[in-house]
Amino acid sequence: MNTRRLLLMTLLLLGAAGCAALRPSTGVERGAAPSGPGDVADGSGWWYARFFIERPAGEPPRWYIGTLIGGEVIAPVFDRHYQDILIWRVHRRAGNDDYGHVFSFIFYSTAAGAQRIYADLEKNPVLQRLRKEGRVTKVGFDDPSRITRPRIEDTSDRHWSLSVQQTWPALAMGASRMWLDLVGEVADKHADEQDLEQRYIEVQQDVNDIWAKQGQHAVLHHISGIFAYQPLLITY
């Protein structure tokens, strides 16, 4: 097995649990954002919208639920509130622990912008349906009355150098934008499927196939090129 193939397989293994070992930064989890303007802090910072996804014991993660949330909940809210968002990304994790399977929308905004986004998410009919059916067991929002992550590096991995912590969010946003647009493109091809959950099962399968066949060149190769094709140390 050549070195390039070994590195690719290692990357796939590292991603299998969706950052299972790394819990996202914690904030105050709320069922809904406060509605009064007096409750909102001044300034900007990072905000999380966390969607806790049902995972029956002994079953693998239902990754397509996160993809459904991305396509039907996050995308329309983002389109309506892009002016409130400086930088953003999505995050997944599905560890076999108490925290469980969580899909997160993470964005840098003013507290007032976060309040508007949270209020819009709460009203999303697809999210309401997922919660009613038990597919999403809980939604967690941060408290817009206080800003706990004001710096651009505040949601990056503390094990990284400060320069990487400060610049990595741009890479994560680009990858998240590519993924979200890809989900939208693929979902349009399955528009004839009336059952929403089945549609996104098919979307997830198609996205998996695209990633498996094209991710090495479209993503890994070109990122490697940006960094001058230098050796990469991978540890696990």
Positions of predicted regions on the chain:
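N-terminal export leaders
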Residues: 4-9
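An acidic, charge-biased composition feature
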Residues: 16-236
